[in-house]
């Protein structure tokens, strides 16, 4: 069985992603390792905002959504400028953020805030990864980022969920949209 982080990484690889940009932090180390195992190269940046623009560059070169990774709190806040830019410039991006476990969020207050409340207001969509729906959430995120008017989609991944093994059943995948020829 694969962990949630491994499933996310595998689905991103299947979507054509080969690079992820960001800054390491305790809450995203499991995700970083899974990205590497799946075949995505992690590129260390000096600021999350610059990582976002690098992710945009990979979209323009490859046609696959860019991938930006940020750790809890300030790491997420540092990326807001780029997320707004990606929404305005129609850049498909998967923005993966690490967070503390929900039970800890009530007592562990160092650099903790509601990522979905901040990013959800400026992105096409924001999801919190939950057990049993990892495949569905990542597939939906990639689809939303690429379909219609492209843009950034946020997925918040707690440390507990990232390392937890997920069921082997493969859910039905969404059919990729096909271009329609004019009549």
Cite the ranges covered by each PLM segment.
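N-terminal alpha/beta PP-like core and its mobile active-site loop of ThDP/TPP-dependent enzymes
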Residues: 1-183
């Amino acid at each position: 069985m694969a962990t949630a982080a491994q499933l996310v990484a595998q689905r991103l690889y299947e979507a054509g992603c080969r690079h992820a940009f960001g800054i390491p932090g305790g809450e995203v180390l499991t995700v970083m390792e899974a990205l590497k195992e799946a075949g995505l190269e992690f590129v260390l940046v000096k600021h999350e905002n610059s990582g976002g623009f690098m992710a945009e560059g990979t979209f323009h070169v490859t046609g696959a959504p860019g991938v930006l990774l940020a750790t809890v709190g300030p790491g997420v806040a540092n990326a807001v400028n780029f997320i707004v830019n990606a929404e305005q410039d129609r850049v498909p991006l998967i923005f993966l953020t690490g967070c503390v476990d929900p039970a800890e969020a009530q007592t562990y207050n160092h650099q903790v805030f509601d990522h979905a409340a901040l990013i959800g207001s400026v992105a096409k969509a924001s999801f919190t990864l939950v057990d049993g729906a990892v495949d569905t959430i990542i597939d939906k995120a990639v689809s939303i980022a690429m379909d219609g008017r492209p843009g950034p989609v946020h997925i918040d991944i707690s440390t507990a969920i990232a390392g937890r093994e997920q069921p082997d059943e493969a859910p039905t995948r969404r059919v990729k949209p096909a271009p329609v020829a004019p009549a």
